[in-house]
Amino acid sequence: MSRTTPICQYRNIGISAHIDAGKTTTTERILFYTGINHKIGEVHDGAATMDWMEQEQERGITITSAATTAFWSGMAKQFKPHRINIIDTPGHVDFTIEVERSMRVLDGAVMVYCAVGGVQPQSETVWRQANKYNVPRIAFINKMDRMGANFLRSVKQIKTRLGGNPVPLQLPIGSEENFKGVIDLIKMKAIKWKDIDQGITFTYDEIPSDMIELSEKWHQNLIESAVESNEELMEKYLSGFVLSEKEIKSELRKRSLNNEITLITCGSAFKNKGVQALLDAIIEYLPAPNDIQDIKGITNDKASTVAFRSSNDKAPFSALAFKIASDPFVGNLTFFRVYSGIVKSGDSVLNSVKSQRERFGRIVQMHANKREEIKEVYAGDIAAAIGLKDVTTGDTLCDLNQPIILERMEFPEPVISISVEPKTKADQEKMGLALARLAKEDPSFRVRTDQESNQTIISGMGELHLEIIVDRMKREFSVDANVGKPQVAYRETILNKVTDIEGKHIKQSGGRGQYGHVVIELFPLESGGKGYLFVNDIKGGVIPNEYISAIDKGIQEQLKYGPLAGYPVVDIGVRLYFGSYHDVDSSELAFKLAASLAFKNGFKKAKPILLEPIMKVEVETPDDYMGDVIGDLNRRRGIIEGMKDLEIGKIINACVPLSEMFGYATDLRSQTQGRASYSMEFLKYVEAPSVISDLIIQKRER
């Protein structure tokens, strides 16, 4: 079976926004207008198609990135059918990982902003992630029907807060309860959607007389933005020639694809106005897979040669697994983006990261939580595979004979932990399986067993993140668990370099003995919260090569539980430069134990310190409560980094230790009578004050 939609008619897009900007509602309207849903699902009644987890429907927020496919031929049926693969991403900061991995596999993004709240804190995080992966984007300013809606204020904030170059394609006709439609600034016509059929049909009308002057001003702005990078068209425009619609759109598309401008649309998804024109803009101004640069990777040979794959069905197959999800009926679903080539169900491919062969059992196209089985997928497709055994997020799947490893995704380290204990003996085994599966799905979630207490410790990106993990254990795996208080994920490191650190493991009491002897140097690495470097400087074969990896392994095992307070050790280098061995008694185990002893001894002499996670906190508060909010942040050992003015208040930026932020939401609510909001994300690890680290170490020693 050959490709039914040419690759130039594909659009792989993500829909991203701050929580409650109306992103899921916007996606629901897209599914309605593209003909997939016959009844519009509303978030507030728990019926939204894209929010398919029970927790999402209860809380009215999106947690996982649901993927779906839709087709669009234009509001006026002016295009050939375009295939739009949509990923709906969460707006809560605890689920930033979902946004990050979606951005990695997308070609374009739609940023949804609330016309009342404008650019809110999480919007900045999402914008930075789109910048990181160089994703072209357009904006949809939603909720134009709400009290306090202000389109031009939101446009200005995209420039001032995000550093974007916003160019409106439309102006709203009226706002709040008087919002009637939009003005198309290219055609210079008013678009009004009919309420009788939920906005499926529309009319082009003349621009209202009281808006002609404003429309002319923004029409000129649009044309000037279009011709700015094209000298020939600029001259033509300045000479008084009228540019054609085709010329304007072509230049806007080029500039949008180069990330030079962000085109702005507006509407009210809830009132069925504006999403239809947004769909047209997705097709006209966001890239097809063959518009973006060839994907970069390395060949998995010894030289690790840089290689590229183009969005072409004839190129060797390459794809990136960007999400693993558990399905109650088929087990693991592996979501993947095909960058080049074709793969059919039943084909064998290589997981080049793990050097393992995998077989595509079945391939399915996803529509939220519904599945449609398909036989093959092509370059540019996003689909899910059933039957892949050992694939994790970020792995590359590729042609067996032409291997490539695509650039990997980076995942943040968890910053908060809680202990979980099964309530009954029956829950014990089920809990292990449940946590293993959930950890496979989510790279920002970790599970470990505390060596001393033997408790199971789970770690994640925030309180809500872990709350939902515990909730999913109960709902999906029927595991009841008692949950401990949140704990901070501290780290350990050293400040000084120490040398001549010896580790000996010698046992010779009848029978075959054990002999391992190493001499190492420990040194601090640049701070970052995760580094480890092992340098083998053995000369003259004083320790045979076969034991070197065992020495490295022995040290790495010690890194998991630091000697200071049992927290992971980071930012440390180890140089192995001397030792000795015994022809008969030496073994890998003996050298592993000798290395562990040397590391423990050296760590204590190298001025060990505890590192604590610092969070970037952004609080939006009315002016009346500013003093109280700042005072409270100072009491929490926070450092105020700066403030920005809002029309009715301030945004306060601060850096605060995570250990001081537990229960902050409740405290902020009571301080400001519920009128302030905040967001928080991990920033960096820094040395904990001695009064804090002494307390933690004493607690550990008890």
From Swiss-Prot:
The keyword Nucleotide-binding applies. Gene3D superfamilies: 3.30.230.10, 3.30.70.240, Elongation Factor G (Translational Gtpase), domain 3, P-loop containing nucleotide triphosphate hydrolases, Translation factors. This is Elongation factor G. The gene is fusA. GO terms for biological process: ribosome disassembly. PROSITE patterns: G_TR_1 (PS00301), G_TR_2 (PS51722). HAMAP family: EF_G_EF_2_B. PANTHER family: RIBOSOME-RELEASING FACTOR 2, MITOCHONDRIAL, TRANSLATION ELONGATION FACTOR G-RELATED. Belongs to the TRAFAC class translation factor GTPase superfamily. Classic translation factor GTPase family. EF-G/EF-2 subfamily. It comes from Buchnera aphidicola subsp. Schizaphis graminum (strain Sg).
